Regions:
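Bacterial N-terminal signal peptides
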Residues: 7-17
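Sterically constrained small-residue positions within well-ordered secondary structures
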Residues: 10, 52-54, 74, 262, ...
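Active-site-adjacent loops and short helices of periplasmic peptidoglycan-processing enzymes
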Residues: 21-211, 222-226
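Domain-terminus/edge residues, biased toward the C-terminal soluble/receptor-binding domains
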Residues: 177-181, 189-194, 198-405
């Protein structure tokens, strides 16, 4: 079993290394000793060793790179846990989807039902029978974590909260959340209401990727409603300028939970901490995980969406060659200092390629491997545009050519 190091150990190691370094004030004050031994030769491709992740006081947790999806560290990440108000990440996803496709508008007025008004737990203080704009309810849910605002949104989109929960589960299925099931929109405890740290991280990544126009709501520090100032419960928003979301959660049975995203120098990380013993513990754990990821890893973009990777000959086609590439940006995350060792290999799934090909048709695979040969990513190669068949003479000539291929 790998021993986890406390977050303070990283600072201590750095201090000792600095004090011992030639030219440091401490080293200069030390009496001269024997001549230092020559350094041990290190291969140029070797990276500094990556230490164990920091010790985290929580039931389960995960650290994931947003762009590559690589898990940098985790503990019991697939264990079922109560999500508490992290449930509202999926509520937000469903509402954002309704906004994006025009079924809902930010200015739509939602009538507050008695069911929403009587919601237990945290509140936005909306009153039964009043009409409240959707954009205010979104802030009430995301910033204040109000259960009343959350249920009002669920009823506005789904008709009833029960019907909305079915929509949540369908989106969970589409996003590949294999350890998640919802029975309500706000996260109050129920035996059939559960998730996992990995699923929460996957959902957080989907929110950032699919709804960049709405994601800034998660960084709103406070807002006013009914002359009540309502603040964001995510304390890291005020402590780390790179943190720009996502959501807190807490019930007595779930403990203190926090899903966090931060962006530094183009690298975005997502951490999820479930079942911490206190607000302080969940924030310290999240900060330590993010610091670990940014200190010891880096993410690079290897290919851009629709970038041509191969231009193979296409038989029986109107044009002799076709552009084959990747359908989306390709990223990988490696230990710092190892980016130069990353290699890519493009391989067609069958040869020769014969027209017609449709745009987006899968024709191969791009493999990404590190210096040791370990495969990091597998990305489909697709036809970047349609390749129609050529004329009768072209098809006849290539039919003969294929006999000798």
């Amino acid at each position: 079993m790998t021993r986890l190091l406390p977050a303070s150990a990283f600072a201590l190691i750095a201090s000792i290394a600095y004090a011992a370094a030639p030219g440091s004030p401490v080293a200069k004050a030390t009496a001269p000793g024997p001549a230092p031994l020559p350094p041990v030769p290190v291969p140029a491709s070797a990276a500094a060793p990556v230490p164990a992740p920091p010790a985290v006081t929580a039931r389960s947790w995960i650290l994931m790179d947003h762009f590559s999806g690589r898990v940098l560290a985790q503990q019991r990440a697939d264990e079922r846990s109560e999500p508490a108000s992290l449930t509202k990440l999926m509520t937000a996803y469903v509402v954002f989807a309704a906004l994006a496709d025009g079924r809902l508008k930010p200015t739509d007025m939602a009538t507050i039902s008695e069911h929403a008004w009587r919601a237990e737990g945290s509140r936005t203080f909306v009153q039964v029978g009043t009409r409240v704009p959707v954009d205010i309810l979104l802030k009430g849910m995301i910033v204040q974590s109000g259960n009343d605002a959350t249920i009002a949104l669920a009823e506005q989109v789904g008709g009833t909260e029960a019907a909305f929960a079915q929509m949540m589960n369908e989106y969970a299925r589409r996003l590949g959340l294999t350890s998640t099931h919802y029975v309500n929109s706000d996260g109050l405890p129920s035996p059939e209401h559960y998730t996992s740290a990995r699923d929460v991280a996957t959902l957080a990544n989907a929110l950032i990727r699919d709804f960049p126009q709405y994601y800034p709501l998660f960084s709103v520090r406070e807002f006013m409603w009914n002359n009540i100032r309502q603040g964001n419960r995510n304390g890291l928003l005020g402590k780390d300028p790179s943190v720009d979301g996502l959501k807190t959660g807490h019930t007595d049975s779930a403990g203190y939970c926090l899903a966090t995203s931060a962006s530094r120098n183009g690298m975005r990380l997502v951490s999820v901490v479930l079942g911490a013993p206190s607000i302080k513990a969940r924030e310290e754990a999240s900060a330590a995980l993010l610091g670990y990821g940014y200190t010891f890893y880096e993410t690079i973009r290897l290919k851009s969406a629709n970038e041509t990777v191969l231009k193979p000959h296409i038989y029986k086609a109107a044009s002799e060659f076709a552009a084959i590439g990747v359908p989306h940006d390709v990223y990988t995350t490696v230990a710092r200092g190892q980016t130069a060792t990353v290699k890519t290999k493009a391989q067609l799934s069958r040869e020769p390629l014969i027209a017609p090909l449709t745009a987006g048709q899968n024709v191969g695979e791009l493999t990404v491997a590190d210096g040791s040969g370990e495969v990091l990513e597998r990305v489909p190669l697709v036809a970047l545009s349609a390749v129609p068949q050529g004329g009768l003479w072209t098809r006849a000539w290539d039919s003969v050519s294929l006999m000798f291929h």
